[in-house]
Curated annotation (Swiss-Prot):
An annotated GO BP: negative regulation of chondrocyte differentiation
Motif Nuclear localization signal location, chain numbering: 108-129
The name this protein goes by in its record: Parathyroid hormone-related protein
Alphabetized PROSITE patterns for the sequence: PARATHYROID
Pfam families registered for this protein in UniProt: Parathyroid
Signal peptide: 1-24
Taxonomy of the source species: Eukaryota, Metazoa, Chordata, Craniata, Vertebrata
Organism listed in the record: Rattus norvegicus (Rat)
Record region (Disordered): 74-177
Positions of the propeptide segment: 25-34
Subunit structure of this chain's protein: PTHrP interacts with PTH1R (via N-terminal extracellular domain).
Length: 177
């Protein structure tokens, strides 16, 4: 009885400690898959795109290898000094551009890649011309500050001049402002 109980417990502990695969993947693998960072997803996406691009290039290279060799043979038989007919143009035959797959679908038709413009150096900002309202306010302030006896004007007229030697003390009664 004890032996059977120990066997059942050991099997139970083994099954609980062993990670059961789910749909062919381990449980740890599923947990890791859910915790991937965005940068890791981008890296895997870029890696997949580059592998797909490489496979496509190999496929296209093997497909058009005979066409390239036939074109080279045909041009080598023509004399080097002969001129082409005036109505024909010698455009290189391109079956697929090297830029395919590197750009998004919106960018595939662009010939040049995006060039970054140089950054503007931060300089002094140009001050806008002050409006009429500001100029009028400045004029009012100037005229107010020129009036004698107003605070902030700097021109204070004392009704009694301080010429006596006793009025030089700093008593509050002798101050006028």
């Amino acid at each position: 009885m004890l032996r059977r109980l120990v066997q059942q417990w050991s099997v139970l502990v083994f099954l609980l400690s062993y990670s059961v695969p789910s749909r062919g993947r381990s449980v740890e693998g599923l947990g890791r898959r859910l915790k991937r960072a965005v940068s890791e997803h981008q890296l895997l996406h870029d890696k997949g795109k580059s592998i797909q691009d490489l496979r496509r290039r190999f496929f296209l290279h093997h497909l058009i290898a005979e066409i390239h060799t036939a074109e080279i043979r045909a041009t080598s038989e023509v004399s080097p000094n002969s001129k082409p007919a005036p109505n024909t143009k010698n455009h290189p035959v391109r079956f697929g551009s090297d830029d395919e797959g590197r750009y998004l679908t919106q960018e595939t038709n662009k010939v040049e890649t995006y060039k970054e413009q140089p950054l503007k150096t931060p300089g002094k900002k140009k001050k806008g011309k002050p409006g009429k309202r500001r100029e009028q306010e400045k004029k009012k302030r100037r005229t107010r500050s020129a009036w004698p006896g107003t605070t902030g004007s700097g021109l204070l007229e004392d009704p009694q001049p301080h010429t006596s030697p006793t009025s030089t003390s700093l008593e509050p009664s002798s101050r006028t402002h």
